[in-house]
Amino acid sequence: MQENQQITKKEQYNLNKLQKRLRRNVGEAIADFNMIEEGDRIMVCLSGGKDSYTMLEILRNLQQSAPINFSLVAVNLDQKQPGFPEHVLPEYLEKLGVEYKIVEENTYGIVKEKIPEGKTTCSLCSRLRRGILYRTATELGATKIALGHHRDDILQTLFLNMFYGGKMKGMPPKLMSDDGKHIVIRPLAYCREKDIQRFADAKAFPIIPCNLCGSQPNLQRQVIADMLRDWDKRYPGRIETMFSAMQNVVPSHLCDTNLFDFKGITHGSEVVNGGDLAFDREEIPLQPAGWQPEEDENQLDELRLNVVEVK
């Protein structure tokens, strides 16, 4: 009996550490990009996946201790996909006491009608979903729209655009919506997917499958995701360093004439960012920038349902 109690305490301790890290990551992202302001009404887009559940949970937790006042309203889009469990999210949100709205739109039927069998439906589905969410945000009086993309999603998008699109473009933590009327935020921008997965497993969120529409996963994105996971295992700290690089861009040492006036460089111009170091040996640190020792993976994997909330 005493041994079981010790295991439970250990599980609780490890979950507390994990939740504190997620809280810290989200808090830093909110502060760095001024994502949430006094009086904001945040529309939390809840898909039923691990990312959006975690986002809602951490935002609720931060709401209790934040120095500013803001409100949350969870929104789910029921796209009428076959087999969608309509009861799951309402039951979960009512149990939490969270304000919510379920928007019912048969986008599944529209996509099936417009897209030939065997072709990917994701692009049209995404456009339809985006428009509905923008409209819903206006109806609810939301000042911000929160999406559940995390650090791994952002890096994957960067490499997708580099490898297949020929441009250095990622996924911004904060942006103006397509219609120019809403501010979209990504509070999980600094969070690692593996932390989110462990947290979701420990909390036993009622996950809704993301493939109900029958669409196949994006093969190109999957290749990139596998590549990043392999790097993360073989080269500790590489992922952190790459993400740090996205926050430390030096336009004068790239090739985009729209970002830097290369034509304006003439005799007598000032040295910019150290000038040309091409002939100098690069000083590479022994450990990648942004790297921190990984916590005991076995301890974090022991997380179960016996949890205590971090206030």
UniProtKB/Swiss-Prot annotation:
<dbReference type="Pfam" id="PF01171">
    <property type="entry name" value="ATP_bind_3"/>
</dbReference>
<keyword id="KW-0479">Metal-binding</keyword>
<dbReference type="InterPro" id="IPR035107">
    <property type="entry name" value="tRNA_thiolation_TtcA_Ctu1"/>
</dbReference>
<keyword id="KW-0460">Magnesium</keyword>
<keyword id="KW-0808">Transferase</keyword>
<keyword id="KW-0547">Nucleotide-binding</keyword>
<dbReference type="InterPro" id="IPR012089">
    <property type="entry name" value="tRNA_Cyd_32_2_STrfase"/>
</dbReference>
<keyword id="KW-0820">tRNA-binding</keyword>
<keyword id="KW-0819">tRNA processing</keyword>
<keyword id="KW-0067">ATP-binding</keyword>
<dbReference type="GO" id="GO:0034227">
    <property type="term" value="P:tRNA thio-modification"/>
</dbReference>
<dbReference type="InterPro" id="IPR011063">
    <property type="entry name" value="TilS/TtcA_N"/>
</dbReference>
<keyword id="KW-0963">Cytoplasm</keyword>
<keyword id="KW-0408">Iron</keyword>
<comment type="pathway">
    <text>tRNA modification.</text>
</comment>
<keyword id="KW-0694">RNA-binding</keyword>
<comment type="subunit">
    <text>Homodimer.</text>
</comment>
<dbReference type="GO" id="GO:0005737">
    <property type="term" value="C:cytoplasm"/>
</dbReference>
<dbReference type="GO" id="GO:0016783">
    <property type="term" value="F:sulfurtransferase activity"/>
</dbReference>
<dbReference type="InterPro" id="IPR014729">
    <property type="entry name" value="Rossmann-like_a/b/a_fold"/>
</dbReference>
<comment type="similarity">
    <text>Belongs to the TtcA family.</text>
</comment>
<feature type="binding site">
    <location>
        <position position="213"/>
    </location>
    <ligand>
        <name>[4Fe-4S] cluster</name>
    </ligand>
</feature>
<feature type="binding site">
    <location>
        <position position="122"/>
    </location>
    <ligand>
        <name>[4Fe-4S] cluster</name>
    </ligand>
</feature>
<dbReference type="GO" id="GO:0000049">
    <property type="term" value="F:tRNA binding"/>
</dbReference>
<comment type="function">
    <text>Catalyzes the ATP-dependent 2-thiolation of cytidine in position 32 of tRNA, to form 2-thiocytidine (s(2)C32). The sulfur atoms are provided by the cysteine/cysteine desulfurase (IscS) system.</text>
</comment>
<protein>
    <recommendedName>
        <fullName>tRNA-cytidine(32) 2-sulfurtransferase</fullName>
        <ecNumber>2.8.1.-</ecNumber>
    </recommendedName>
</protein>
<dbReference type="GO" id="GO:0005524">
    <property type="term" value="F:ATP binding"/>
</dbReference>
<dbReference type="GO" id="GO:0051539">
    <property type="term" value="F:4 iron, 4 sulfur cluster binding"/>
</dbReference>
<feature type="binding site">
    <location>
        <position position="125"/>
    </location>
    <ligand>
        <name>[4Fe-4S] cluster</name>
    </ligand>
</feature>
<keyword id="KW-0004">4Fe-4S</keyword>
<feature type="short sequence motif" description="PP-loop motif">
    <location>
        <begin position="47"/>
        <end position="52"/>
    </location>
</feature>
<dbReference type="GO" id="GO:0000287">
    <property type="term" value="F:magnesium ion binding"/>
</dbReference>
<keyword id="KW-0411">Iron-sulfur</keyword>
